[in-house]
Amino acid sequence: MNKNTQGKPSGKPVRRDGVDPVLRSRARRRAVQAIYAWQISGGNAQSLIAQFAHEQAREIADLAYFEALMHGVLDNRRDIDEALGPYLDRGIEEVDAIERAVLRLAGYELRYRLDVPYRVVINEAIESAKRFGSEHGHTYVNGVLDRAAVELRKVESGH
């Protein structure tokens, strides 16, 4: 077995820092679903995280990253919404619930997870919007995040 894949559930090469990109993608997809469920139900965030983590444990695989994303988004929602606000064409609560969940997750990663390259954040968000969102939702998500990244990741985006 290749040393880069040994012991990793996805079987794909991992980065030097030990991160398995496939497992992170799964964690992001599940986080989008959990954020969506939280937005719709308005229920207790901690209970939702625990329930979702328990039910989805096999699929998530990178449970620690899923939980970090969930706590990050829920604990910083107002700040994330404010950071995204100037790049939206309407209030955040008026954005379709799936696209809103995708934007909040990506907004969290752009603002707080500087270990994740902004292009990865945007690409993952586009893929989630394509998978779960409306027909053209990914185009909207891409436009918002491209503009937001210029401000939130000035050094990285070269502006």
Curated annotation (Swiss-Prot):
SUPFAM superfamilies, per database record: NusB-like
Annotated spans, Disordered: 1-20
Single GO MF descriptor: RNA binding
CDD domains, per the entry: Terminator_NusB
Pfam families named among the record's database cross-references: NusB (PF01029)
Signal peptide: none
Alphabetized UniProt keyword annotations: RNA-binding, Transcription, Transcription antitermination, Transcription regulation
GO cellular component: cytosol
The family this protein is said to belong to: Belongs to the NusB family.
Protein function: Involved in transcription antitermination. Required for transcription of ribosomal RNA (rRNA) genes. Binds specifically to the boxA antiterminator sequence of the ribosomal RNA (rrn) operons.
Protein name: Transcription antitermination protein NusB
Species assigned in the record: Stenotrophomonas maltophilia (strain R551-3)
Lineage: Bacteria, Pseudomonadati, Pseudomonadota, Gammaproteobacteria, Lysobacterales
